[in-house]
């Protein structure tokens, strides 16, 4: 009996030793590389393969991993360069295969419309024992770091963009869910200004990207902060909250509008990022230290301001609520003012081929004193020390029209006719010349 137990123990030791040798050979051979390639490919929903693995203890290195997308995935291609990883073999005793740390030198990822390709039939596999059958069905990666990540994309409309030169650190919290931190990098999409990324924190899983906090800047000192959610399973439906400060007005308004100042505000974007320009933007905007050439819309008001000693019109601030969609902007609760001399309030809309606004304009007696009859016939309401009137704006952004001049001339004509009678014609001509200098 004693000899039998010794023999049985020797056999068990031999089996375990042989199994270890076999498993050791399997891990360091192409079979494990194939198994690992399939697991990673399934995770990124692509077809990929590792370059040969070289081992040092429980760590391995590979020159890279390359993958191509499929028709059901927006990932078109993925190339990972110079990979090093460490496997925690002790987790096998718990039924898990865990890579606890991965370091990557560079990633190049290309997203867009899925690649049309046929699905090859799997080659029949002969039955038999495989060491891969002993491995857990799931592979877990606890943490990875990318020294240089670059993501490129193209929308369904053909607009391209990229997020380049960023460092990414990611930690897996649960199956297919990662906490992501990106530091540095540049984002550019279509013809929009380049955004410099300071730091981004978020979560990504199979269904969505959640941005917990993203901080960025534009040239000129503009600060941007973003939070929100982007669906990635099918359509790129997004809800993004954007706060910004010190945005130069020439980034937003055409040069012909002659606006100057710094914008700040809070905006909410809702829409499909594949059709970004069709999304809806709502929120509020404020412009401080504003300079504006009133002649672009209010030619009359511009001249009155000059005659009133306000040659360079600088508004203390402009505030408004906006709603933008399909290249059309609606504004409400619009308020603009200059000291105690000028106030403009109202609402309206602006599009590529139209301007439509209903405003009320308040002017000081100092300005109105230059136009006889203006207070009595046009600026008839008094409030907050100003005289007010309604103004209708129409036309196009290139050629806006207002109905103020006609009413001022009519009031002036009536005033002159009543006071000077026969000399009214010359007085009216003088006024028209004055208003159109």
Where are these regions (language model features)?
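N-terminal type II signal-anchor transmembrane helix
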Residues: 1-45, 426
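N-terminal leader/targeting pre-sequences
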Residues: 45-71
């Amino acid at each position: 009996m004693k000899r039998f137990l010794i023999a049985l123990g020797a056999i068990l030791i031999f089996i375990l030793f042989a199994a270890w040798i076999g498993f050791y050979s399997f891990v360091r051979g192409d079979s494990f590389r194939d198994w690992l390639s399939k697991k990673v490919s399934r995770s990124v929903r692509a077809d990929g393969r590792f370059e040969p693995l070289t081992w040092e203890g429980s760590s391995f290195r590979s020159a890279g991993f390359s993958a191509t997308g499929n028709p059901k995935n927006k990932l078109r291609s993925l190339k990972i360069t110079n990979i090093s990883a460490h496997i925690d073999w002790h987790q096998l005793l718990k039924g898990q295969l865990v890579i606890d740390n991965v370091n990557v030198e560079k990633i190049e990822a290309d997203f867009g419309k899925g690649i049309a390709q046929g699905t090859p039939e799997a080659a029949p596999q002969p039955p038999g024992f495989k060491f891969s059958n002993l491995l857990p069905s799931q592979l877990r990666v606890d943490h990875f770091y990318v020294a240089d990540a670059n993501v490129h994309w193209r929308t369904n409309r053909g607009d391209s963009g990229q997020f380049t030169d960023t460092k990414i650190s990611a930690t897996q919290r649960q199956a297919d869910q990662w906490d992501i931190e990106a530091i540095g990098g540049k984002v550019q999409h279509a013809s929009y200004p380049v955004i410099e990324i300071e730091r981004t924190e978020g979560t990504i899983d199979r269904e969505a990207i959640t941005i917990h906090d993203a901080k960025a800047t534009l040239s000129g000192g503009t600060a941007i902060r973003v939070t929100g959610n982007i669906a990635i399973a099918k359509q790129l439906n997004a809800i993004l909250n954007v706060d910004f400060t010190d945005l130069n007005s020439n980034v937003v308004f055409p040069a012909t509008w002659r606006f100057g100042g710094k914008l700040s505000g809070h905006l909410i974007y809702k829409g499909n990022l594949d059709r970004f320009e069709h999304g809806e933007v709502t929120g509020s905007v404020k412009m401080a230290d504003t300079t504006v050439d009133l002649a672009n819309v209010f030619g009359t008001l511009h001249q009155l301001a000059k005659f009133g000693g306000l040659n360079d019109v600088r508004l203390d601030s402009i505030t408004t609520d906006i709603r933008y969609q399909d290249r059309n902007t609606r504004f409400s609760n619009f308020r603009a003012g200059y000291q105690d001399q000028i106030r403009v309030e109202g609402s309206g809309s602006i599009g590529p081929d139209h301007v439509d606004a209903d405003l009320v304009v308040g002017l000081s007696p100092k300005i109105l004193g230059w136009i006889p009859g203006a207070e009595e016939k046009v600026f008839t309401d008094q409030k907050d020390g100003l005289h007010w009137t309604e103004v209708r704006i129409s036309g196009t952004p290139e050629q806006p029209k207002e109905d103020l001049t006609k009413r001022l001339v009519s009031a002036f004509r009536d005033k002159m006719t009543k006071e000077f009678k026969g000399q009214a014609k010359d007085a009216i001509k003088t006024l028209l010349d004055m208003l159109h200098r």
